[in-house]
Amino acid sequence: MYRALWLSPLRFIVSSSSSKLTPYVSRGRGLSGIDNGAGCSCSRSVTTMIGNEFIRCQDESKILQLQIVDALRSGERQGASALLFKLIQGNYSLSADDFHDILYYCARSPDPVFVMETYSVMCKKEISLDSRSLLFIVKSLCNGGHLDKASEFIHAVREDDRISPLLPIYNFFLGACARTRSVYHASKCLELMDQRRVGKNGITYVALLKLAVFQRNLSTVNDIWKHYVNHYNLDILSLRRFIWSFTRLGDLKSAYELLQHMVYLALRGEFFVKSNRGKLHSTRLYIPVPSKDETGSEKFAFGVTDRIVDCNSSSKVALPKGHNKILAIRVLRWSFNDVIHACGQSKNSELAEQLMLQLKVMQQQNLKPYDSTLATVAAYCSKALQVDLAEHLLDQISECSYSYPFNNLLAAYDSLDQPERAVRVLARMKELKLRPDMRTYELLFSLFGNVNAPYEEGNMLSQVDCCKRINAIEMDMMRNGFQHSPISRLNVLRALGAEGMVNEMIRHLQKAENLSAHSNMYLGTPTYNIVLHSLLEANETDMVINIFKRMKSCGCPADVATYNIMIDCCSLIHSYKSACALVSMMIRDGFSPKAVTFTALMKILLNDANFEEALNLLDQAALEEIHLDVLSYNTILRKAFEKGMIDVIEYIVEQMHREKVNPDPTTCHYVFSCYVEKGYHATAIEALNVLSLRMLNEEDKESLQDKKIELEENFVMSEDPEAETKIIELFRKSEEHLAAALLNLRWCAMLGGRIIWSEDQSPWARALSNKYG
């Protein structure tokens, strides 16, 4: 018995425009004629199978049905058609029951072609369809992808027929619409269900939820949830479906609330049975009766479960044979997996902490999630740099056969430069007897290869320690049967170069080159770039040139980074001609000069005090629409400061302002110091004031006037001895430019300068604009 529980249209799932289209249904002589595609438009009546006794098929018709099914299974379609013709030519009366086996097979196969052939034969013999026949036909057409034809069958049954299709037919059709994401057909079916007052049950809502998730329509899911709790008992299976929907649509708060309620039901010991086809069903007797005293949403909000019956009560139904009893813990784990996966993807750290508390509650009740779930979520947390949460999750794992979650955590520690915490990860892997893979060793070389860098330069002690670490990792790697990969080799070379171990780095490079020669492969360009850069940092210009020649001779192509390194090398040997030749090679290889290229060329010219050509390069970059950064301008400012060339300083400052390049503290230092050394102290203070304001981003500049009084009282003009400490705190909040600007303004005030909060108030800024603008 199905009650019409929700008669208001559910057409919020689709646009209202889709309801204007209807599939074509032809009407014949009978009560419900359907165009079967073969010119068969016949009369028939649909009879119910509920409350009626079935007449047994004659033995001969039963045998013919089985023979037809066997022929279809073996692919003998012509033989099956011949047997079907023989079936209808018998001297006995036939009913829809004599075709059930055939139609059932066509529904399971699916075989929509033969099901229509069978239906055509039934039309010719004027055999009335019953509800089972109609269900099998609709299933066959839906499973075969013919939703249009299945929709015609459902719509063709008129109100004056002896019965309408039962709710399972509508539910199956809606499920097929959800699987194929056919919103139009689902809309037409829902309209028909409302017109015929068929009602809905839990299976209907499952299909509607899938359609709503497909459309990314969270409001629809909320509406379905409200209607569901008003008319149905909440059990673990229904909660799982809604949790799945909310997590897919990103409503983690609602999903978490339902998960808590689900844990409550699981702790009460609700059981399920699993059918032979893998379907889960509750063991409780289920009769949907709407509550009259309060809405289901209100009951859920207060945590009242007045209609939930204990598993040990008399309402439990007997379990049929052939079913396996399954604890609700499995369903709970699935839902917990959904929520925690979504939490990891959304990087919601607050909810993640709540989930960890929920996890502890579940563990106390032996409801621990799957190890695979914990591992996957730990990997997500590591990518989001939530290393504390990731490490906590990995500590909960009792068994793991793959190393990727641990590798992700090692990579996070590498990004955060926290190698000391990586030691605990390795210890945990050893506890789990988890064998490292190549990615693990690549990360170990990156984490533990260098000792002092980037904080200090390498010394003899750190270099010895670096060699010991690298050798230990290599020995363990070989014990586990791994050879160096391109990434691990690159990390080793980078570590040796950072420690200044040039000879050891060259030895590793030669070893890698020999191995590559035996395998008829060349080392990758990034590997050579690491070596070239490290040699350049060590001022080993001759070795840089030799490595570059070896690289070209072995056929390894150079990239933009390679050419820029070599142009930088030319600045050390003071050869502008060689740098120009490299630029020519770079262009021939298809690479366009970038900002770093122009900076390197200007550095060579400035080393020879050729400011005019350096400024010409600056203008050329502007003509070619190459946006130079603050490092490029600081390169010129540094040389101008060393030479005491105020005119060049002022020109570069105005050029930066015109190109909208914000200065940094280094820029302020060069400009301020140059004016001070020339004795222009008042101008130096004013310039420092203006450049400090220009360091701020647009958002800070817009709010500067509103916060001017507060900043003056608390930071700039404050006599509090802790004022500078408070300013430094801004660095920890990643507001380094604001902190540097406030420190500069405070020093300007201490030097007796008048603080201005707008560039327009500065005579110095206006003078530069008039002179060079």
From Swiss-Prot:
PPR repeats mapped onto the chain: 130-165, 166-200, 201-231, 235-269, 332-369, 370-400, 402-436, 524-558, 559-593, 594-628, 629-663
Keyword Metal-binding: no
A Pfam family it matches: PPR_3
Family to which this protein belongs: Belongs to the PPR family. P subfamily.
Protein name per Swiss-Prot or TrEMBL: Pentatricopeptide repeat-containing protein At1g76280
Entry keywords, A to Z: Repeat
Protein source organism: Arabidopsis thaliana (Mouse-ear cress)
InterPro entries in alphabetical order: Pentatricopeptide_rpt, TPR-like_helical_dom_sf
Keyword DNA-binding: no
Gene3D superfamilies, alphabetized: Tetratricopeptide repeat domain (1.25.40.10)
NCBIfam families in UniProt: PPR (TIGR00756)
Lineage, opening ranks: Eukaryota, Viridiplantae, Streptophyta, Embryophyta, Tracheophyta
